[in-house]
Amino acid sequence: MFSTTSIVLWFTILLPVTLPVSIDNRDLLLKRHVEPNDIQFFNQGVRSSLSYIYQKRDVSDSDNEQVLRKSKKKKKTTSTGTPGNENTTDFASAQEFEKWEGDREGWQISAGLYFDKAIASDSCDSDSEDEDEGRKKFWIFTDDAPVDNENLIVSSEDKLELNYISSGKNLEGLTKVIRKAKGNSTTYNQSKIKFNVDAQGEDQFESGFGSLIPYNSFYLYILLFCIIF
């Protein structure tokens, strides 16, 4: 009896350490070097991805590099090989799209995250007129996401944009804007990437079913199970 009780107690104590994150996004979290629903660690992982993007851009051939800048009033396409064009648009803030040599294809996702301008001063060379001078939005690349598949958990307070970057294709017309979700979060279609930008509490984790479960309730169920059995 004593040994059984000890085993149950040790299992309850060690459970938080061995508890898996999410079946769907565990590999993503490990790859980004972040913890679930921790904004600070998440931003660090995203900045790591950003440095990879700009490193690829810096070593690329400038003749094959194309930069599309979006601002409030104008959308300008600049290319070193062909003349650019201008179109009017009503985007809310300045954003950058970049393509480098190697023609990497995939969905480019704006997760609504920002970083300080000082951190990006060495890598961001955009001269767009952004009202918020101290912050700039950047983009995260998915891995091996097909053209017709995208999966995002969209916050009710954010509007995300998906842009497919492909070799020899015009970026215009490929932008898909995901409007605000009616509930707390909404999942769209299928893909490997799942960003939950609506989670703010540290006492929550994302389960394999994509729902948010409070830690307190979860451990209460475990405790009741141990008492009964």
Swiss-Prot record:
Predominant localisation class: membrane
Q: Which residues, in ranges, are excised as the propeptide?
A: 209-229
Induction / repression? Up-regulated upon interaction of cells with host macrophages and upon milbemycins A3 oxim derivative (A3Ox) treatment.
Record membrane topology: Lipid-anchor; GPI-anchor
Q: Does the keyword Lipoprotein apply?
A: yes
Q: Name one GO cellular component term.
A: side of membrane
Q: Where is the composition biased (Polar residues)?
A: 81-92
**Compartments where located:** Cell membrane
Q: Where is this region: Disordered?
A: 63-92
Keyword Transport in the entry? The reply is no
Q: Where is the lipid attached (GPI-anchor amidated glycine)?
A: 208
The job of this chain, per UniProt, is described as: Predicted GPI-anchored protein which may have a role during host infection.
State the name under which the record lists this protein: Predicted GPI-anchored protein 19
- UniProt source species: Candida albicans (strain SC5314 / ATCC MYA-2876) (Yeast)
